[in-house]
Amino acid sequence: TVSYPESCYQFGDKWYYTYRPNGYDSDIKWETTETYNIGLDYGFLNNRIYGSVDYYQRHTKDLLNTINVISGTNYSSVITTNIGEMDNKGVEFAINAVPIHTKNWKWTVGLNYTWNDSEITKLNVIDSDANFVQTGAISGTGKTVQVFMVGQRPYTFYLAKQAYDDNGKPIEGQYVQPDGSISATETKYATNKSALPTSYLGFNTQLTYKNWDFAISGHGAFGNYVYNYVAADQYVQSVYSDQGNFSNILRRTKDSGFQNQQLYSDYFLEKGNFFRIDNISLGYTFQKLWNGSSSLRLTLGVQNVATFTGYSGIDPEIYSGIDKEVYPRPRVFSLSANLNF
């Protein structure tokens, strides 16, 4: 069996880690993908404008994922196995332009856009009480908020539809049922909202003037959703203190008014659209130094400059779509020197 150093035992005042067996699938296979695509490269005005257009279709077999298993059937409550098949189709478009090109000036601009549609077409194993496979664990006790379901996108969120009062405030413990009624029954449903974006955007531009150069690059993703587990796990008003002007209640906790956890409420499902400015750099090149063949380039740069998003958490760029224990991306300032001789 596969083992990991996850168990620990206490002897005296010290804890010692040891290996314990974990579940595995002895019949697991490699995930395979067949891809078909057609593309076109183009250029105009002596390649002052150029780029490409591609259309692709992909069929993935033996799709790998970690899913819950029935208690007592293995050494673990989850296992990595082949769950089914998936289709992808999409369009990739890229355009580059040189708007200015003179003796002293040069300006280049690049833009790429991708649209992608994915769908689960077959499931090898399904849960006994429903036609889907659960995934997206939010705790070590089997709680999940995502599913793989035939006809739906991968990592579709599976939550209860929160009920709201006339003022738009969520009603604790009340959910909208499939027939439109409101009750305390926590009926979960496939939200048709996935952790995977439907489109991606990339951008870069560079401006040079004599020995100076300035560059910006960024990227974005749209159509994806993020389950804010950090908020769902902590925004419980009963654990805070409210003593008049001395209150430690978070604003969002006060807005919801929840006294208890509502982990399966789609109140905590948010749009994950974002655009991030990844890098900005400014450089200067000193040419013909010393013997005339040497050069020195100095560059001042900033990484992770800014993120534009409506998401309330720290970072909307989370592949799993579950905001849980995400380490913040640092903003990095750098000064570099490159000497050639």
Language model segments and positions:
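A short local loop/turn or secondary-structure capping micro-motif enriched for an aromatic residue
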Residues: 60-61, 179-181, 193, 223-225, ...
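Short acidic/glycine-rich loop or secondary-structure boundary segments that cap or lie
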Residues: 119-121, 169, 173, 185, ...
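C-terminal extracellular loops and terminal segments
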Residues: 78-87, 129-154, 191-206, 234-238, ...
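Extracytoplasmic gating/loop element in the C-terminal half of outer-membrane beta-barrel translocons
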Residues: 219-303
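Glycine-rich, aromatic-lined ligand/substrate-binding cores of catalytic
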Residues: 194-227
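Flexible glycine-rich, low-complexity coil/linker segments exposed to the extracellular/periplasmic environment
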Residues: 1-23, 137-194, 241-268
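Extracellular/periplasmic, surface-exposed regions of secreted and cell-surface proteins
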Residues: 1-145, 210, 269-341
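Short, surface-exposed charged micro-motifs
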Residues: 39-41, 161, 173, 204
